[in-house]
């Protein structure tokens, strides 16, 4: 594997590493993401940052103090737009039951976000749009994959297992994207900055969950590429993808990241991987120059 073409490594099984390897990876700015037995994210080897910018860090902190709600609202509105896009796809294919949620997003959701007075109210609007989205799954997914409620650690059924795994993969992709910018991973706007996680990656990945994670899941499930009896290990209180299921999901996830769409602002085709990085640069433009985010 040519090191020059490698940006990140994913360790999905037990591995042994030494300092010589870590030093080599650091010199070549390669990020390593580690996962545990339960398919959960364990952590990231994050090489010395080559893109440090003291000026941007100062401005990012100032934006947290002065513009947090503005940025958080932009993120949550982006989530709503992408959920709308996913549901409209099914509405066009005769799943008319989703119209109620589409109408709610168009008529009420954006008003609710705009009228929110603080981050807590913004997150309440975000929580509501996700819950309404989950409620539509029964209209276009097989019965085996219908969600009763969102359960994360550990996931308790196949659909929760897929969502948790997909969200984790997207989170790590976002960590890698932000690493290539001057942004500080620790200073977030929608999620509360906290110790032990890159909270800005949580912010920036949220917008893309509907169009990357959920579209990947829906396509795999509805085309029967993932099946409950063949691709999951279910225990008493948790459910996980088996090795074959993980391979199928990762392959589809990667394909989705490299698929293209017409970017609203650029008016040209870009991949979702590129769009993720572009959002990071748009945030930088807002922080430094006040350009719309």
Where are these regions (language model features)?
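A surface-exposed, charged beta-strand/loop segment in the N-terminal or early-internal portion
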Residues: 13-85
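Active-site helix-to-loop segments that bind/position phosphate- or nucleotide-bearing substrates
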Residues: 52-293
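N- or domain-start disorder-to-order transition segments that initiate the globular core
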Residues: 1-2
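Alpha-helical/coil-rich non-catalytic "connector" segments in signaling and regulatory proteins
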Residues: 8-10
């Amino acid at each position: 594997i040519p090191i020059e073409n490698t940006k990140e490594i994913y360790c999905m099984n037990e591995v042994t590493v030494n300092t010589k390897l870590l030093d080599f990876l650091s010199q070549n700015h390669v990020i390593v993401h580690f996962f545990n037995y339960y398919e959960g994210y364990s952590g990231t080897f994050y090489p010395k940052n080559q893109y440090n910018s003291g000026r941007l860090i100062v401005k990012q902190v100032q934006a947290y103090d002065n513009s947090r709600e503005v940025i958080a609202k932009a993120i949550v509105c982006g989530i709503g737009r992408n959920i709308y896009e996913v549901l409209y796809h099914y509405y066009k294919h005769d799943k008319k039951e989703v119209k109620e949620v589409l109408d709610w997003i168009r008529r009420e959701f954006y008003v609710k976000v705009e009228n929110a007075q603080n981050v807590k109210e913004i997150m309440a609007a975000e929580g509501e749009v996700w819950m309404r989205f989950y409620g539509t799954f029964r209209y276009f997914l097989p019965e085996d994959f219908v969600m009763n409620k969102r359960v994360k650690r550990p996931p308790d059924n196949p659909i929760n297992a897929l969502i948790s795994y997909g969200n984790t993969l997207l989170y790590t992709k976002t960590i890698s994207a932000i690493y290539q910018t001057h942004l500080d991973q620790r200073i977030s706007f929608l999620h509360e900055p906290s110790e032990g996680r890159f909270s800005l990656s949580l912010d920036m990945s949220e917008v893309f969950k509907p169009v990357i994670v959920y579209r990947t899941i829906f396509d795999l499930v509805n085309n029967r590429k993932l099946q409950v009896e063949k691709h999951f290990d279910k225990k008493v209180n948790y459910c996980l993808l088996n090795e074959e299921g993980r391979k199928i999901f990762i392959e589809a996830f990667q394909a989705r990241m490299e698929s293209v769409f017409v970017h609203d602002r650029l008016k040209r085709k870009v991949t979702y991987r590129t769009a993720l990085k572009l959002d990071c640069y748009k945030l930088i433009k807002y922080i430094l120059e006040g350009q719309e985010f």
